[in-house]
Amino acid sequence: QGLTTPYTVAVDINGNEQNGTGILALSTFGPITAGAGYFNNQNINTNITNANFNPGLLGSVVRYSAGSLGLTGGEDLYVATVQGDLDFVKLESWYLGMQDTFNSYTLAATGKIDIAENAKIGLEARYVNLKLDNELASDDDRKNSMFRLAVDGKVSIVNARLAYTQTGKHGGLTAVDQDAKNASLGWFLTSNGVPDAKYWQAALGADILDNLNFTLNYGNLKTDLNNSPVEFKNQEVYGQLTYKMSKNLTTYLRYGTYEQKVESSGVKQTDNTRGRIQVAYTF
């Protein structure tokens, strides 16, 4: 069964999914939805080291830390949620606990505002707190957190988004998949697992046709890994042309640049240019 939580991705078009053996049940009472779940095994151990894929030295440091959790896939997993739909705003609270590994909670509020017939704005505020078990880390090193504020909108054919994410100074591991809601993801960049990160994301695009859109994306992530002598500055710019052929068939062309620099020395650790074409059909 797929693990449908803001920490995980239950269904992924590229096959990188989290699932387990167990049950997750939800019940709705008017505007309130409550649920709980238990899984006696899962495949989080195969995904956690890829939960951060930042290139260069920064990514190597973060992935090493995630790999040191020593997961086997046999750990028990506990899930609970309470959600409220108040029409103008949706509220979510989640708990996720893994046996002898971590305990975490998420608080989120999202809303949609129709300001005109062809103008809509979306808002999000999200906070995640994850604390590692005593056996895995000590004192402040156990603490991981992030908060994100985001606004997106579409006016006629123009779409835009602006988001700011900041992770805790001791740790930023708040999801077990880089595509999960509890991680802020660009293309080359992700906040997940990065301590003391300050991450800005911006996007501006337009519909060329009803089913053809071009969007330019920008990302800037800075961190000194909690006052270490090394301060990283990461920046990416990429454009994406998306063509939705049908309800189930989508293709995109993406091209952009990524740069990682050590601020103290001015040395570029990474300077990449890359492109990607993807054609995907969902059933």
Report residues per predicted region.
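Gram-negative outer-membrane beta-barrel proteins
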Residues: 4-10, 42-46, 97-103, 115, ...
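Residues that define the transmembrane beta-barrel architecture of outer-membrane proteins
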Residues: 17-21, 28-30, 74-78, 85-87, ...
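Membrane-embedded beta-strands of outer-membrane beta-barrel proteins
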Residues: 23-25, 34, 80-82, 91-93, ...
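Transmembrane beta-strand segments that form the barrel wall of outer-membrane beta-barrel proteins
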Residues: 1-10, 34-37, 80, 88-99, ...
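Outer-membrane beta-barrel "beta-signal"
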Residues: 80, 202, 243-245, 271-283
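Outer-membrane beta-barrel strand-turn architecture
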Residues: 28-31, 83-88, 97, 113-117, ...
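Detector for outer-membrane/organellar transmembrane beta-barrel domains
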Residues: 85, 110-224
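Outer membrane beta-barrel
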Residues: 1-54, 82-89, 153-170
